A protein has these predicted regions:
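N-terminal accessory beta-strand-rich subdomains and adjacent acidic, glycine-rich linkers
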Residues: 1-186
Length: 187
């Protein structure tokens, strides 16, 4: 990085998607200010996603939109996409330990970016999203640090895998094995 800090990117390419994660050398707690990992989709890509504060005990209605119209929307992973060429895609994270769970944000030009919110809340956008009348929401965490530490005395902070899965149909997407392949084995 320009500031002299070092970090590493691990990436895996699969026949049906990609996964990447960051490793940050550290011998103790570090402040995390945000993330720039993003995917850009073709105009006209269809997206289905949940958006809202799930911690309040009610089920959030899934949204049915185009990536052309999701700027400033919060997309709870996994978000599912249908590209104009008929390819299905899903974005999520895998192997989450000692790190803040991510959400996705709709950005300009059909870009979907990983980011963080306090308690995975809702970014208010004036779009009806199925929120209850009380409209619980939280502001997006922007340039407000949160603290993470290396896992179990290790000498680096490891982010969850950022996973993009691809398939010809929904069955292929559901049966995608990337998450299992990049995650730690169960105890």
């Amino acid at each position: 990085q320009k500031d002299g800090n070092t970090y590493y990117i691990d990436s895996w390419e699969f026949d049906d998607g990609v996964a990447l994660r960051y490793r940050i050398p550290s011998d103790g707690p570090r402040c995390i200010y945000g993330e720039q990992t993003a995917y850009t989709f073709p105009s006209g890509t269809h997206v289905w996603y949940a958006s809202g504060p799930f911690q309040y005990g009610w089920i959030q209605a899934y949204q049915d939109r185009s990536t052309d119209s999701i700027k400033d929307e919060l997309l709870a992973p996994p978000a599912t996409f249908l590209l104009p060429n008929g390819t299905y895609a899903a974005i999520t994270e895998a192997n989450l330990f000692n790190f803040h769970g991510a959400v996705l944000f709709g950005k300009e030009n059909n870009r979907v970016q990983f980011g963080y919110v306090e308690n995975k809340g809702h970014v208010e956008t004036e779009i009806i999203t199925g929120l209850p009348d009380s409209k619980f929401w939280h502001e997006e965490v922007r340039n407000i640090p949160w603290i993470t530490s290396p896992r179990n005395g290790e000498n680096e902070i490891v982010t969850p895998w950022r996973v993009l899965m691809l398939a010809e149909d929904l069955n292929g997407l559901v049966n995608n094995q990337i998450i299992a392949q990049v995650s730690d084995r169960p105890d």
